[in-house]
């Protein structure tokens, strides 16, 4: 038989709201920890008197009764877990776990039974419903009616406001059944009645929330705040935690009382009661009890006469009456030596206190965040002009808290504190405009594998390559229309005609030099474009026969473990699967990772070997291709070098232009159409006719003409 039993996702009903938590059964007793509030129920094994198993709305439930009349109910068990629990109760608690069914007839008449702190409405021997009397806030009576009103839970979507019972009259003389019913309820109900004298009174205390000065009257079961406008009665059972926090100026102290449910002022709810004290203010306090009562009730924690600082007296009395520890700041010390950090939350500035088990911010609005609620924290820069940073906290429920305007000098201390508490740090990247000097705020999760991020990087690379390829393609279209050989011919044709009478030889020489320089410049630009085009074609023309790159150790492990993760988490999405795999990989030990590192190393060696073989084979084929290309180019050059028929002036100009032709132009693609060639022939014939018309007659012709 196991020494302990643990159950997750167990629910406890708290004033109409179902709070999940974790239940642990051991030989010493039963412990339930509320996941939302962190409150712990500890039931000693010797206090248990009865255990009941029954069907409820959330599966099956466990009802436990103790010797002092307390009742604990936990729901969310499966039917198959009954035998395991029954054997555990018999072995360790010597109790029989009884099965009991609820009545579902739907009748509205029956018998009311009071047992411990429960009111049970029964039909026959079966209970219909039960009301915890500690949830009753008010009990009023009528002629034949009793009305119960309840404390409200702000977290409950639907709340039960009141229940009204009709109590029929009886024939017994001297007994009022309505009054008897009401007295049974009031004896166990959490109804605040300021009867008797207060144990002590603190006058005119400064309260930050709710704002004002209040007289605090301490009663045995509740705290009474009496102000000029409002009165609050706070039962000690609603106090969750107590905090005593030193102000940054070292002259004041905060005393914070965490409440659940909160006190209300109109539509405003106050989850925290914050008192502000001066360290220099002292008080002498006398309790309104005799010494024997003080000793018996508080067991040495308080004495009848006490004196000291006002904040010490208030905190000491509250600790004794509420019976809860006072939380103080831990070992954290900021840059200025204080145990807190000055920052802003929402629209107000305040103080953030790093505690041993959480963070608390005071005072407007006060915020308390436990470490077990935190999903991750983040350090981020606010703007470029301020020397400050933001500290962000996101809870597991998705709520985000941003504490801004923290001095840069506090960064190191806060970062070390967060690391020491082993909180997850997720840096979302520094905001735009950050100086290079702020690299201190780099992400601490560099080693964490993010499959989604890697996939996005790969897609970005592919898009960038496609963009480059498309730009190169557009460049090729413009390059094809640029044929340097043809342009040179056009330039040469401008000088085909013999010098006209109006042009000088010097001007012609200078024009030729300028044209030559321009042609050289164009040739160089074309060569650069062609080289860029070739490199882009090499990128595009990826050989499908080339060896594939080896996978990393993580990817090898992921491919082998993907099906197992899917089976362990049925219905998981692809994104969540990658995220889950990254978490599992990060949590793996070095010994387990070494196996996949070896496989990755073997794959890398095989890739390098295959790459060498592939490069060797590709080198031979490329050499053959190059020799073929050289032969083709040589043949074209020989073909072009043969002198064309025509006038001597035209051939000389053609030779001049050919002297500036590069190898690239000689081997350019033969894209000139026959139509362009015919146009040029017609243009050359017209030029020759113009030359004949414009040439002056020779001396011999003129002489013969004169003779005629």
Curated annotation (Swiss-Prot):
Taxonomy, superkingdom: Eukaryota
Region (Disordered): 458-708
Subcellular compartments: Nucleus; Chromosome; Nucleus, Nucleolus
Site description Cleavage, residues in chain: 450-451
Post-translational modification: Phosphorylated by CK2 following UV but not gamma irradiation. Phosphorylation inhibits its DNA-binding activity. Ubiquitinated. Polyubiquitinated following caspase cleavage resulting in degradation of the N-terminal ubiquitinated part of the cleaved protein.
Positions bearing Phosphotyrosine: 441, 452
Compositional bias per record (Polar residues), positions renumbered to this chain: 695-708
Cellular-component GO terms for this entry: FACT complex; nucleolus; nucleus
Amino acid composition bias (Basic and acidic residues), ranges on this chain: 512-546, 577-624
Modified positions (Phosphothreonine) in chain numbering: 170
Family, per entry: Belongs to the SSRP1 family.
Functional summary from the UniProt entry: Component of the FACT complex, a general chromatin factor that acts to reorganize nucleosomes. The FACT complex is involved in multiple processes that require DNA as a template such as mRNA elongation, DNA replication and DNA repair. During transcription elongation the FACT complex acts as a histone chaperone that both destabilizes and restores nucleosomal structure.
Protein name in the entry: FACT complex subunit SSRP1
Naturally occurring in which organism (per UniProt): Mus musculus (Mouse)
Taxonomic placement: Eukaryota, Metazoa, Chordata, Craniata, Vertebrata
């Amino acid at each position: 038989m196991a020494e302990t039993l643990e159950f997750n996702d167990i629910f406890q009903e708290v004033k109409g709201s179902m709070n999940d938590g974790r239940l642990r059964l051991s030989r010493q007793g039963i412990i339930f920890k509320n996941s939302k509030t962190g409150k712990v129920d500890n039931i000693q094994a010797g206090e248990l008197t009865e255990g009941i198993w029954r069907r409820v709305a959330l599966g099956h439930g466990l009802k436990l009764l103790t010797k002092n009349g307390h009742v604990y109910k936990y729901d969310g068990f499966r039917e198959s877990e009954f035998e395991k629990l029954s054997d555990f109760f018999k072995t360790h608690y010597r109790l029989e776990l009884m099965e009991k069914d609820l009545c579902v007839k739907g009748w509205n008449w029956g018998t009311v039974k009071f047992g411990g702190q429960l009111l049970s409405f029964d039909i026959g021997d079966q209970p219909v419903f039960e009301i915890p009397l500690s949830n009753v806030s008010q009990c009023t009576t009528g002629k034949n009616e009793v009305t119960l009103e309840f404390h409200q839970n702000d977290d409950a979507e639907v709340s039960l406001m009141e229940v009204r019972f009709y109590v029929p009259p009886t024939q017994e003389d001297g007994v009022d059944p309505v009054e008897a019913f009401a007295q049974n309820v009031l004896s166990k109900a959490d109804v605040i009645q300021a009867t008797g004298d207060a144990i002590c009174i603190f006058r005119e205390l400064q309260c930050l929330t709710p704002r004002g000065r209040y007289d605090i009257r301490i009663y045995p079961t509740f705290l009474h705040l009496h102000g000029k406008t409002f009165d609050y009665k706070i039962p000690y059972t609603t106090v969750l935690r107590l905090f005593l926090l030193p102000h940054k100026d070292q002259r004041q102290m905060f005393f914070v009382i965490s409440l659940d449910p909160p006190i209300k002022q109109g539509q405003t709810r106050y989850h925290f009661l914050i008192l502000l004290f001066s360290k220099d203010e002292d008080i002498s306090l006398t309790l309104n009890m005799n010494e024997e009562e003080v000793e018996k009730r508080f067991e040495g924690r308080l004495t009848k006469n006490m004196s000291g600082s006002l904040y010490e007296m208030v905190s000491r009395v509250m600790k004794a009456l509420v019976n809860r520890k006072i939380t103080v700041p831990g070992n954290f010390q900021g840059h200025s030596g204080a145990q807190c950090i000055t920052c802003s939350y929402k629209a107000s500035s305040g103080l953030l206190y790093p505690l041993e088990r959480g963070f608390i911010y005071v005072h407007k609005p006060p915020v308390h965040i436990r470490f077990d609620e935190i999903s991750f924290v983040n350090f981020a820069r606010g703007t470029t002009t301020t020397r400050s940073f933001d500290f962000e906290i996101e809870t597991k429920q998705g709520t985000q808290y941003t504490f801004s305007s923290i001095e840069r000098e506090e960064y190191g201390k806060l970062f070390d504190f967060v690391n020491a508490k082993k909180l997850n740090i997720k840096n979302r990247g520094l905001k735009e405009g950050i100086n290079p000097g702020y690299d201190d705020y780099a992400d601490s999760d560099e080693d964490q594998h993010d499959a989604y991020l890697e996939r996005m990087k790969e897609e970005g690379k592919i898009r960038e390559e496609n963009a480059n390829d498309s730009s190169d393609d557009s460049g090729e279209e413009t390059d094809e229309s640029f044929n340097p050989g043809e342009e040179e011919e056009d330039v040469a044709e401008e000088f085909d005609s013999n010098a006209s009478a109006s042009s000088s030889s010097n001007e012609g020489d200078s024009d030729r030099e300028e044209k030559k320089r321009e042609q050289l410049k164009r040739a160089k630009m074309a060569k650069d474009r062609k080289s860029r085009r070739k490199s882009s074609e090499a990128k595009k023309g990826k050989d499908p026969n080339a060896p594939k790159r080896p996978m990393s150790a993580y990817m090898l492990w992921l491919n082998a473990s993907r099906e197992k993760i899917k089976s362990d988490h049925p219905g998981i999405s692809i994104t969540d699967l990658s995220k889950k795999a990254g978490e599992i990989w990060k949590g793996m030990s070095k010994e387990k990772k070494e196996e996949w590192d070896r496989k990755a190393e073997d794959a890398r060696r095989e890739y390098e070997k295959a790459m060498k073989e592939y490069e060797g084979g590709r080198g031979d084929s490329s050499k053959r291709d190059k020799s073929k290309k050289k032969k083709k180019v040589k043949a074209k050059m020989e073909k072009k070098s043969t002198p064309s028929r025509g006038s001597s002036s035209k051939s000389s100009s053609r030779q001049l232009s050919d002297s500036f032709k590069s190898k690239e132009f000689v081997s350019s693609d033969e894209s000139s159409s026959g139509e362009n060639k015919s146009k040029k022939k017609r243009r050359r014939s017209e030029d020759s006719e113009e030359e004949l018309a414009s040439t002056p007659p020779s001396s011999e012709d003129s002489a013969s003409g004169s003779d005629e």
